[in-house]
Amino acid sequence: MAITVKGLTNKLTRTQRRIAVVEFIFSLLFFLPKEAEVIQADFLEYDTKERQLNEWQKLIVKAFSENIFSFQKKIEEQQLKNQLEIQTKYNKISGKKIDLLTTAVVLCALSEQKAHNTDKPLLISEALLIMDHYSQGAEKKQTHALLDKLL
């Protein structure tokens, strides 16, 4: 929270707002499929006094809810291509599946790009910051590789 002369404000950074969206998407991955309207209504319930939602976040969730299945398909297809590339290039099999947090971070980035046309370098850098926030150093490479090709 930012401190002002008058006291506390509830200004959140864009990264903190992205983290809130990633956490929402992550929690939702366990309960898919859902209708777009239901997902958007669920997000409104995610609003808290400490972390109030804004229109910027709502547009990201709207883009996510309307494109979830096509985004998931793109992620799966790109992950398979990446694994084949590793196998061809290094002659080793990468059986590592994409984890749910990485999926949520990538879905958030794809949704933000769709909703706000945010540029690729910023989205990748923010995604890596979010992975650091959750101490997911090992998954950062995978996240970066996916976003680099999907955005």
Swiss-Prot record:
Bridged cysteine pairs (disulfide): none
UniProt xrefs under Gene3D superfamilies: NusB-like (1.10.940.10)
UniProt superkingdom: Bacteria
Protein name: Uncharacterized protein MG027
Any matching Pfam family: DUF1948
